[in-house]
Amino acid sequence: MLYYALVFFIVALIAAIFGFGGIAAGAVEIAKILFLIFLVVAIVTFVMGLVRRR
């Protein structure tokens, strides 16, 4: 589970670079939304991995 949390976090960072960096000017809003979605998924997956280990 922690592997997936890391993957989702990396995807969120990539979406943030495109959305907040202005690289993809036409898709800024979509990249910002994807950043938030993948950041939430990464946090949830990380917490589930920690809970499952106990």
Curated annotation (Swiss-Prot):
Annotated compartments: Cell membrane
InterPro entries, A to Z: DUF1328
GO cellular component entries: plasma membrane
Primary localization class, coarse: membrane
Keywords: Cell membrane, Membrane, Transmembrane, Transmembrane helix
Topological category with respect to the lipid bilayer: Multi-pass membrane protein
Disulfide bonds: none
Ranges that cross the membrane: 5-25, 30-50
HAMAP family linked to this entry: UPF0391 (MF_01361)
Family, similarity comment: Belongs to the UPF0391 family.
Descriptive protein name: UPF0391 membrane protein Rmet_0093
Organism: Cupriavidus metallidurans (strain ATCC 43123 / DSM 2839 / NBRC 102507 / CH34) (Ralstonia metallidurans)
